[in-house]
């Protein structure tokens, strides 16, 4: 039995017609799933009983099982703990803005990158999510909250470019006008920097936004913060980003988590401005959020000084407004709960 949420539009049409159904039946099914949030064929009343029975034999539509939900008293940010069909768990977040609703979704159970300031990496890595499991996060949040998500950031648990095929396919599904119908420029992939995949992304014809989690201006410091840097140096990553920009023309966001006494020195700001010189970028400065590690935020004065140096050197920069930290839903705070090994 196939997970219908794993299928692209073209694949679903092919599957439906191979069963002897008319092509337009695929559109009817997708309207039920993506617009009405119905995942039971028996409720799809514009399909005949015979067709419903046939579809039930061949497809499942597994939304996610909600284990827990926490709502921030500060800003309404909502964090969801989901159970997957194999018993593993992931977290997703819904963020509310005056003009939009953004979903922060996961691409892996755990994360193999193990950034020292990120709770997800502390829990280890179990497996990649399927395309359907990535898509189901959006549908399950929309059904639970009865609200339409307009923006998606691939910034939850996991490194999206280490689950490349499923990440890209899920984006095509979420963007398709008869499926998720989310504008492509409203979708952002965040990566610590996998050079060959960044270059491959430029060839996909997907005009998504790209965010690079850099966090340090030198390899010496980044090796300590992002262990994967020992495999892919800052120079290799930024070279890939430059190739990406030449091919797409798109501005790239640089994510920089600021940690007191580690990467927040004035010299760090000057070096960061130097390595990003002449690039079409925007820097998001993120004061570190509390996790199990004893890492401290810089002072407000230091944050402003860091930002000022970037601006003085022609680098656009802003200090990100924190959302959901009181429920551990902010940057770097998502973690695995009740891990069950699939081995």
Curated annotation (Swiss-Prot):
Subcellular location: Cytoplasm
UniProt catalytic activity: adenosine(2503) in 23S rRNA + 2 reduced [2Fe-2S]-[ferredoxin] + 2 S-adenosyl-L-methionine = 2-methyladenosine(2503) in 23S rRNA + 5'-deoxyadenosine + L-methionine + 2 oxidized [2Fe-2S]-[ferredoxin] + S-adenosyl-L-homocysteine; adenosine(37) in tRNA + 2 reduced [2Fe-2S]-[ferredoxin] + 2 S-adenosyl-L-methionine = 2-methyladenosine(37) in tRNA + 5'-deoxyadenosine + L-methionine + 2 oxidized [2Fe-2S]-[ferredoxin] + S-adenosyl-L-homocysteine
GO CC, one annotated term: cytoplasm
Cysteines engaged in disulfide bonds, as pairs: 104-331
GO biological process: rRNA base methylation; tRNA methylation
Cofactor binding note: Binds 1 [4Fe-4S] cluster. The cluster is coordinated with 3 cysteines and an exchangeable S-adenosyl-L-methionine.
Catalytic residues (positions): 91, 331
Residues given in the record as S-adenosyl-L-methionine binding sites: 158-159, 190, 213-215, 289
Radical SAM core domain boundaries: 97-326
Keywords: 4Fe-4S, Cytoplasm, Disulfide bond, Iron, Iron-sulfur, Metal-binding, Methyltransferase, rRNA processing, S-adenosyl-L-methionine, Transferase, tRNA processing
Enzyme category, top tier: transferase
Predominant location: cytoplasm
Cofactor: [4Fe-4S] cluster
EC numbers: 2.1.1.192
Residues given in the record as [4Fe-4S] cluster binding sites: 111, 115, 118
GO function terms (MF aspect): 4 iron, 4 sulfur cluster binding; metal ion binding; rRNA (adenine(2503)-C2-)-methyltransferase activity; rRNA binding; tRNA (adenine(37)-C2)-methyltransferase activity; tRNA binding
Protein's UniProt keywords contain Methyltransferase: yes
NCBIfam families attached to this UniProt entry: rRNA_mod_RlmN (TIGR00048)
HAMAP family given in the database record: RNA_methyltr_RlmN (MF_01849)
UniProt cross-references to PANTHER family, sorted A to Z: 23S RRNA METHYLTRANSFERASE (PTHR30544), RADICAL SAM CORE DOMAIN-CONTAINING PROTEIN (PTHR30544:SF5)
Leftover remarks: Reaction proceeds by a ping-pong mechanism involving intermediate methylation of a conserved cysteine residue.
Role: Specifically methylates position 2 of adenine 2503 in 23S rRNA and position 2 of adenine 37 in tRNAs.
Entry similarity comment: Belongs to the radical SAM superfamily. RlmN family.
Protein name: Probable dual-specificity RNA methyltransferase RlmN
Species of origin: Thermotoga sp. (strain RQ2)
């Amino acid at each position: 039995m196939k997970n219908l949420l794993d299928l692209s539009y073209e694949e679903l049409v092919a599957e439906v017609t191979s069963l002897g159904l008319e092509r337009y039946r695929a559109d009817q099914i997708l309207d039920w799933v993506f617009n009405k949030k119905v995942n039971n064929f028996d409720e799809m009343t514009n399909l005949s009983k015979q067709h419903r029975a046939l579809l039930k034999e061949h497809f499942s539509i597994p939304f996610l099982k909600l284990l827990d939900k926490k709502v921030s008293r500060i800003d309404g940010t909502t964090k969801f703990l989901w159970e997957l069909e194999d018993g593993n768990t992931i977290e997703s977040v819904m963020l509310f803005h005056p003009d939009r609703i953004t979903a922060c979704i996961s691409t892996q159970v755990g994360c193999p990158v193990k950034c020292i300031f990120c709770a997800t990496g502390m829990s280890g890595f179990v497996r990649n999510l399927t395309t359907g499991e990535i898509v189901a996060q959006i549908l399950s949040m929309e059904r639970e909250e009865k609200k339409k998500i307009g923006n998606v950031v691939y910034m939850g648990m996991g490194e999206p470019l280490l689950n490349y095929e499923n990440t890209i396919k899920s984006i095509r599904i979420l963007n398709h006008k008869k499926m998720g119908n989310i504008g492509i420029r409203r979708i952002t992939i965040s990566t610590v920097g996998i050079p060959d995949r960044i270059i491959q992304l430029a060839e996909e014809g997907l005009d998504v936004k790209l965010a690079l989690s850099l966090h340090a201006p030198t390899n010496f410091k980044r090796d300590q913060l992002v262990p994967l840097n020992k495999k892919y140096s800052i120079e290799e990553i930024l070279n890939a980003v430059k190739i990406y920009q030449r091919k797409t023309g798109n501005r790239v966001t640089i994510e920089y988590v600021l940690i007191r006494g580690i990467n927040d020195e004035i010299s760090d700001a000057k070096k960061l401005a130097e390595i990003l010189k002449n690039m079409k970028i925007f820097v998001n400065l993120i004061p570190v959020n509390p996790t199990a590690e004893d890492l401290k935020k810089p002072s407000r004065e230091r944050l402003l000084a860091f930002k000022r140096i970037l601006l003085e050197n022609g680098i656009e920069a802003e200090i990100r407004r924190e959302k959901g930290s009181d429920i551990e839903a902010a940057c770097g705070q998502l973690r695995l709960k009740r891990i069950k090994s699939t081995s």
